[in-house]
Every structure is written in structure tokens, then in C-alpha cells.
């Protein structure tokens, strides 16, 4: 056999064995069933439903492709994650699903460059979690007569957690009483959360500066796989 022919056959066999170079995996948001229709997305992902830690990443849609703008270690509910449509209030679980972001808030002044609506937390600021109140799952300032303080969050009392935050639109537009209230993306406390998603303070400030209301940012919360996988939402 001619040397040149032998080399060609060997080369061809290598190509057949190895195959073509694998295509790069699509960015995570591109693998989601829905991203909310905007061009900014926050992805909060835990390994499993029983996990209390994971990652948060935030993404921009640029020229038809999702590009990661940042990422941070994240914490979830002390009892893990649960499908948002079946969650029950007071269970210390983080609701999975795709949600809008109604507004930002904080005990501290907004980071320079913040463009989302940002409500300052005052001594009179509360989040009503009383299922009997007309203000259920709403920011109230001051606390209305029909909302019991013992069933609600006095926002200024939660430092450093509420130094900076974004409201997650879970159970927000048409609240189902008893499903849950006051689910936020906020600054880390000492450990796992009561159902919110938390990140380090510097990263929370970065997210606030990054989010642009004109680009309709959303947040998706879920697991790496299974029935609560972020790619299902």
C-alpha cells in the first residue's frame, strides 16, 4: 500500500472514531421553556429540592444570544425548594418557577446606577403576611389596621438581609392566601433563608445596578434537574 494512501486511511479512521468536534452547549437561559419575554434574566439554581445552597447567575440577551453578566453563590430556604404552585406559607421553602420583579427596596440607599424602582425601607415599612388582610403579600407603609404585625415582617428589623433587595413576584398579582408572602432576592443573613433567595451583599448591589426595567427582567428559580428543573419554566 502506498504510504500516502495509508496515511489518508488512518486519518479517515481517526475522524470516524472521534467524530466532529462537539457543539458548544447552549447558554442556560436558551434551554429554558420560557424566560418571561424580556432581555434580562436571573437564574437561581440549586442542585436538588432538599438543597439550601446553589448559584445565582444573571444574563443579558444580546443579538439573539444569552450572555452571562455575573454569578454568585446563593442560599435558599432552610427546608429546600418546592414547586411554587403547591407551596404553603410558613414552611421555609423557596418556591420554584418563573417570576417577574415588581420593584427593589432596601434599608440602605440604592447603589449608584440603579434604575429599577427602589423603595427606601423606613421605620414604618412592613410587608403584610397576614392571610386575613386585604393587603396580603404587599408592601405597606404604615401597617394597616387589618394587618397584624405579628403575622408580618417589619422590614427595617432585618439587617443585613434587607439592606438591599428585589421583590420576587411569587403569589403577587393574584395572591392565593396561605401560599406564601414576602419572597425576595436579598442579602445573605447567617444561614439559609425562610424561603427567599439570598446572595452576598456585593453581588446584590451588582444585580441592582445591572437590572433595567425597560428590559423586563425576570427571575427563574429551580433545580438542576427533575420536576422542578429551571429548564421546565
Task: Name each model-derived stretch.
Residues 196:
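Short cysteine clusters
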Residues 200:
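Conserved "landmark" site that anchors the functional core of diverse proteins
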Residues 23-193, 204-233:
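Cell wall/extracellular polymer interaction/catalysis modules
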Residues 1-23:
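Secretory targeting and sorting signals
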